[in-house]
UniProtKB/Swiss-Prot annotation:
Protein name listed in UniProt: Probable cell division protein WhiA
Keyword Cell division part of the UniProt annotation: yes
Purpose of the protein: Involved in cell division and chromosome segregation.
Source organism: Latilactobacillus sakei subsp. sakei (strain 23K) (Lactobacillus sakei subsp. sakei)
InterPro entries, per the entry: Homing_endonucl (IPR027434), Intein_endonuc_central (IPR004042), Sporu_reg_WhiA_N_dom (IPR018478), Sporulation_regulator_WhiA (IPR003802), Sporulation_regulator_WhiA_C (IPR023054), WhiA_LAGLIDADG_dom (IPR039518)
Length: 314
């Protein structure tokens, strides 16, 4: 069964985007998952992922935007529980592509770790770059079973700072921390995670997330209410047990007939109905119904009277 994060990424890889915005997405994918090597005295670009749908998207975006032919390779893992690695390899026009995406400088050697201002200055390009960044290094917890958490991993501190800046452009309150010789941008608020999914175009995943969140929050509210009512019920039971204990003490020590008429009346009624509420006791008073506060006052008097006699005996 596919994880929730896999469902999000699958939806993102199926989005159709304008070529200009696709460049921003491709820039993130290559900057975060790409590596350069020398082959026959020229640079070769390898973009690696464990997700075949992401590999196909990188291949398609390169072809659509630069009319270049790249290779799609599969590196099979022999160890158990290890996913295959999918590699998009570009052997020709590598510098042209990387320079256009502002990933390397014109000298072909200097790597730009920051996001170019022409992306950061335009909302739709920012959305596309964040989509690529999530596809390349993002994960999100299953909202049904885990605490709310979404993160994007980046190797470079400057790049991480730009991701935080771009996310907070949409009021997402993104935070950052250091992890595994890299940097993490993360969200922990359910509402902000849903907003981010909307920002990067994962509308269906966002709607599913919101549905789960509503049910989960409702379930938590019901549990809190039940716990509160259980606590109140336990208090009521304990109070009734204490009242009966004190009334029985008064009956056995001084006799209920020796109590004032109003106290005797409520004492006899409580002994007859040990489990009913104060409101119900008030409705059953032989001399006429009285309020819950009136019943509570009389029972408190009986408790004080019993405790007073007990102290005298001690």
């Amino acid at each position: 069964m596919a994880s929730y994060a896999s469902e999000v990424k699958k939806e993102l890889t199926q989005l159709e985007v304008h070529p200009e915005h696709a460049r921003a997405e491709l820039a993130a994918l290559i900057r975060m998952n790409g590596s350069l090597s020398l082959m026959n005295h020229q640079f070769v670009l390898n973009v690696q992922t464990e997700n075949p749908a992401i590999a196909r998207r990188i291949y398609s975006l390169l072809k659509q935007n630069y009319q270049v032919e790249s290779e799609l390779l599969v590196r099979r893992k022999m160890k158990l529980k290890k996913n295959n690695q999918y590699i998009v390899r570009l052997k020709y026009d590598t510098n042209t592509v990387l320079n256009d995406l502002n990933i390397v400088a014109e000298d072909g050697f200097t790597i730009h770790t920051r996001v170019s201002e022409d992306i950061i200055d335009e909302d739709q390009r920012v959305r596309s770059y964040l989509r690529g960044a999530f596809l390349a290094g993002g994960s999100v917890n299953n909202p049904e079973t885990s605490r709310y958490h979404l993160e994007i991993y980046s190797l470079y501190e400057e790049h991480n700072q730009d991701i935080v800046r771009m996310m907070n452009r949409f009021g997402l309150n993104a935070k950052t921390t250091v992890r595994r010789s890299g940097y993490i941008t993360y969200l922990k608020e359910a509402e902000k995670i849903a907003d981010f999914l909307q920002v990067i175009g994962a509308t269906n995943a966002m709607l599913k997330f919101e549905d789960i969140r509503i049910v989960r929050d409702m379930r938590n509210s019901v549990n809190r209410l039940v716990n509160c009512e259980t606590a109140n019920l336990n208090k009521t039971i304990d109070a009734a047990a204490k009242q009966i204990e004190n009334i029985e003490y008064l009956r056995d020590s001084v006799g209920l007939d020796n109590l004032p008429a109003k106290l005797r009346e409520i004492a006899l009624l409580r002994l007859e109905f040990p489990d009913i509420t104060l409101k119900e006791l008030g409705e059953k008073m032989p001399s006429g119904a009285i309020s819950k506060s009136g019943i509570n006052h009389r029972l408190r008097k009986l408790n004080q009277l019993a405790e007073g006699y007990q102290q005298k005996v001690i």
